[in-house]
């Protein structure tokens, strides 16, 4: 099942999956910054007659400007996608999963969760904390939950935020395939938290101990 707000791109992706891997995909067009969009996906996930074995909450976007420079409705939309949608879709999926005693959820956060990076960082910190609790709470009922915290990854996400790649040290950039491979390896190993690459594991660990002033310099990387 594929979920996004761009129907045309979803159709292209579904066709590609069918052609390349012989996978038939169910497509749901939904804007997860809107409650009615969330409701469409919630209804599908809570339908016990059509069980979903694994949910990956990967919807998200970042805002180009700093907190006070953004319209408050932009901040609210980001919060709805990054936090509210994760909470509601996890809640919807957990009902059927706990009832049958199996299933899994991967919530995509960010290594930014460990750094002072405005409302985006705060949202990802919520996902990380929520995931750590949920993994323990529902693991006893047969449902696995893992939080994925990638760093700078070569996707259109950072381009849309006007992040200058050349301003970020090359060793900090990760390829999508590497992030996916390490995340799936951690999933297979039963880990509740996945931080791809040793360097980002080190950054996450150090971030818990470094002064906020030092972390603030790091969080400005790539900003115009």
Per-range role (PLM):
Residues 1-12:
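Conserved glycine-rich Rossmann-like NAD(P)H-binding loop of the short-chain dehydrogenase/reductase
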Residues 58-63:
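Conserved NAD(P)H cofactor-binding loop of Rossmann-fold oxidoreductase domains
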Residues 147, 167-203:
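C-terminal helical subdomain
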Residues 110:
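Residue(s) in the substrate-gating loop at a strand-loop-helix junction
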Residues 90, 123-126:
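Active-site helix of classical SDR
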Residues 90-91, 132:
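A short, exposed helix-loop element centered on a Lys and neighboring polar residues
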Residues 66-79:
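Substrate-binding pocket helix/loop in short-chain dehydrogenase/reductase
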């Amino acid at each position: 099942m594929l979920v996004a707000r761009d129907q045309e791109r979803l159709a292209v992706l579904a066709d590609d999956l069918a052609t390349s891997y012989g996978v038939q995909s169910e497509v749901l067009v939904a804007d997860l910054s809107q409650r009615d969009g969330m409701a469409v996906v919630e209804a599908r996930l809570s339908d016990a007659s059509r069980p979903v074995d694994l949910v990956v909450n990967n919807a998200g976007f970042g805002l180009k400007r700093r907190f006070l420079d953004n319209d408050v409705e932009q901040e609210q939309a980001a919060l709805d996608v990054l936090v509210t949608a994760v909470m509601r879709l996890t809640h919807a999926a957990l009902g059927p999963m706990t009832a049958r005693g199996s299933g899994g959820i991967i919530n995509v956060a960010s290594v930014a969760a460990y750094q002072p990076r405005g409302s985006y960082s705060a949202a990802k910190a919520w996902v990380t904390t929520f995931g750590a609790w949920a993994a323990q709470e529902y693991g006893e009922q047969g449902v696995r939950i893992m939080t994925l915290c990638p760093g700078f990854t070569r996707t259109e996400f950072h381009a849309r935020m006007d992040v200058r790649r050349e301003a970020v040290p090359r060793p900090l950039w990760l390829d999508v395939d590497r992030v996916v491979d390490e995340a799936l390896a951690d999933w297979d190993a039963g880990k509740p938290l996945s931080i791809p690459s040793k360097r980002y594991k080190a950054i996450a660990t150090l971030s818990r101990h470094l002064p906020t002033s030092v972390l603030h310099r790091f969080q400005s990387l790539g900003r115009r």
